[in-house]
Amino acid sequence: MKDLISIINVKDHVGETVKIGAWVADKSGKGKLQFLQLRDGTAFFQAVVFKPNMIEKFGEEEGTAKFDEIKHLSQETSVYVTGVVKEDSRSKFGYELDVTELEVIGHSHDYPITPKEHGVEFLLDNRHLWLRSKRQMAMMQVRNAIIYASYDFFAKNGFIKFDSPILSGNAAENTTELFETDYFGNSAFLSQSGQLYLEAGAMALGRVFDFGPVFRAEKSKTRRHLTEFWMMDAEYPFVTHDESLDIQEAYVKALIQGVLDNAAYALETLERDTSMLQKYIDTPFKRVSYDDAIDLLQAHENDDDTDYEHVEHGDDFGSPHETWISNYYGVPTFIVNYPASFKAFYMKPVPGNPERVLCADLLAPEGYGEIIGGSERETDYDLLLKKIADFGLDPKDYDWYLELRKFGSVPHAGFGLGLERMVTFVAGTEHIREAIPFPRMINRIQP
C-alpha cells in the first residue's frame, strides 16, 4: 500500500501519524499498557498501546474491545498499525510508535519459535521461520548490501555482467568435488565456478563478472563450508597478477564500505565492531608469499599462543594456519604464489619458478579464513594442454577452452569471492550457515 512507511524510515516522521504493515515479534505489558515489538523486514521497534487512548478514540465499548484484542495478539500475527512516531532515547532504535489504531491482517497460532533459547538443529529445521528473527534479518541485510555493492563496484569499473551456465560437461576445479547428474544419457556436472566461461567472455567483451550459485561436493562439516553457495567471479584481459590483486583489494574494501553505508542498523543489531571494518578499509592489505608464510609459521609454531600443526614447504594450509597468519598481520592478507601441485591447472607459473603459480588467496582476519581465490591464467596452448593431461583430465572436454589460446590470447587474470564467507566476515558471526537463506550442508537438504 502506497501510504505505508517502513520501520527503518520512521526517523523521518517524528511527530507525524503514520501507518505501518508489520508482524508482532513479541508482546508484553500489564494493566492499561501493552508493548508490541513490531518487525517489517527493515527493522524492529516498539509500539505502545494505551487503553485510555483507544477509549477516547473509539468510545468505551469499542475501545475496550480493541484493547483486549491487542492484549491477546499472538506472536507473528500480521497487522496494520497507525500511530504517532515519538523519539525514545531508552531504546537502541531511538523511536517508538504511540498507537491510535491497529487492524489484524492475518492470525498466527502456535508459532514454534518462541522467544526463548532453541537448539541450532531445531532452528535449521524451521529455517523458513527462523529467518524472521532479528539476527537473521540483519544477516540477510548484510548479504543484500554486499550484493548491491558488488554490482555497483563492477558497474563503476567497466565490467559487463556475463552469465555462465550452471550445468557443464567439465570441471573447473577438483573433479572429486563434483555433483554429477544425468543429462539425456550423458554426464553433466553442477558448476563449481563460472571462471572458464568467464575467460571466453573476457576475450569477447573485456572486463566481465558473474554472480550465481556454485556447488562443491565436499564432505566437510566445518563452519566455513556449504555444498551450495554463491560466488562472485570476475575476469579481465590485459591484466597481470599484481594488477589483479589491486582490483581485488579495491573490491573487498568497496564491499565493506557498502555495508557500513547501507546496513548500519544490521551491523548494530549484530553488535559488530565497525571500527575494525573501518580499519580494513583504511589499511593496505598485506601481501606475503607462500614460502615466507611457511617460514613464519615454522618460526612461531612453538609459541604459547599457537595451536596449529607443523607445516613444510609444499604443504597446503589448514584453517588454523590461515587463522594464525591473518591474525598475525591484523588485516586481510594475500598469500601469493602457492605450489602448483595443489592449485588448479589453469594457473600461470611464476616466471623462473615453475613449481609456484601466480595465484593468491585472500585471508580475512579474526579467524574467517579464505574469502577470495584468484590467479593469472596460463596463456600458452601447449603448456595448458600438458597441465590438463597432468591433472588426469580429458583434453577433449576442454577443446573450447584451449581454443581461447589459439585466437589472440592475451595476459588475463581473475578471481572468485565466496559471498557467504564475505557475509560471515563482515557480519562478525561464527558460522556460514546463517549467511544464506536456506543453507545446504553435507547433512542438510531441507527445508
UniProtKB/Swiss-Prot annotation:
Key words, A-Z: Aminoacyl-tRNA synthetase, ATP-binding, Cytoplasm, Ligase, Nucleotide-binding, Protein biosynthesis
PROSITE patterns attached to this UniProt entry: AA_TRNA_LIGASE_II (PS50862)
Subcellular location: Cytoplasm
GO process annotations (BP): asparaginyl-tRNA aminoacylation
Enzyme kind, highest EC tier: ligase
Coiled coil (UniProt feature): none
InterPro entries documented for this protein: Aa-tRNA-synt_II, aa-tRNA-synth_II, aa-tRNA-synth_II/BPL/LPL, Asn-tRNA-ligase, Asp/Asn-tRNA-synth_IIb, NA-bd_OB-fold, NA-bd_OB_tRNA
Signal peptide: none
Catalytic activity: tRNA(Asn) + L-asparagine + ATP = L-asparaginyl-tRNA(Asn) + AMP + diphosphate + H(+)
Enzyme Commission no: 6.1.1.22
GO molecular function, one term: asparagine-tRNA ligase activity
Keyword Zinc belongs to the record: no
Listed GO CC annotations: cytoplasm
Family (UniProt): Belongs to the class-II aminoacyl-tRNA synthetase family.
PANTHER family xrefs: ASPARAGINE--TRNA LIGASE, MITOCHONDRIAL-RELATED, ASPARTYL/LYSYL-TRNA SYNTHETASE
NCBIfam families on file: asnS, PRK03932.1
Subunit structure: Homodimer.
HAMAP family: Asn_tRNA_synth
Name under which the protein is recorded: Asparagine--tRNA ligase
Source organism per UniProt: Lactococcus lactis subsp. cremoris (strain SK11)
